[in-house]
């Protein structure tokens, strides 16, 4: 049967009420709690070579109540100077994460400004019935293939549509490969909730 669960927790940014066939429909645009880190610009200098990326993230978010940065993998030293100049905390953290080749992923199960530095460590899950699937290829393969030994198959990914609710970082088996849920899109279509996932290998 159907199960209840939270699809998104955050803050309403825009609300529009409209009437359609005698029904009143609310169109709500919401943003995650990390919006609280994207309000004001700050200036900071981090110049100790022994400092770590998580240490910097903790310093940057310290003034924002209930904020938390979660690192699924191993922490690393920066080995150099990082400067935040006239940037919001969120923009600076995104730029810092890009140096590690990692995304910043908001935790949308809370309305607090919680986020992951890299994809969260998910669970082994089942896709369930697949409505449709499109194959895609990550063009970054051509940028790195000449610099190191990489498997072209690791850069093949799938956009899968299903009714099963998964979380970013969850692992599924598809086409004989164990893949990660690296993107998630939720839609209400024909009165039911539909999910589109980008399934990719560890190199994505």
Predicted feature residues:
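Amphipathic alpha-helical and helix-coil boundary elements used as assembly
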Residues: 1-204
């Amino acid at each position: 049967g159907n199960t209840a669960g939270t699809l998104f927790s955050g803050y309403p940014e825009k609300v529009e009420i409209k009437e359609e066939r005698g029904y009143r429909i609310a169109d709500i645009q919401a943003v995650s709690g990390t919006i609280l880190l994207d309000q004001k610009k700050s200036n900071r200098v981090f110049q100790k070579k022994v400092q770590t990326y998580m240490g910097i993230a903790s310093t940057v978010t310290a003034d924002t109540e209930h904020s938390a940065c979660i690192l699924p993998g191993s922490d690393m030293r920066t080995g150099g100077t990082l400067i935040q100049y006239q940037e919001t905390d969120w923009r600076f953290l995104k730029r810092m994460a890009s140096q590690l080749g990692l995304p910043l992923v908001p935790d949308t199960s809370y309305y607090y400004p919680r986020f992951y530095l890299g994809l969260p460590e998910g669970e082994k899950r089942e896709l369930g019935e697949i409505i449709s699937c499109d194959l895609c290829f990550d063009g970054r393969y051509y940028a790195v293939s000449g610099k190191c030994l990489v498997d072209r198959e690791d850069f093949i990914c799938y956009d899968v549509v299903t009714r099963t609710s998964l979380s970013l970082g969850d692992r599924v088996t598809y086409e004989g490969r164990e893949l990660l849920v690296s993107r998630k899109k939720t839609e209400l279509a024909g009165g039911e909730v539909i999910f589109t996932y980008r399934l990719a290998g560890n190199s994505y």
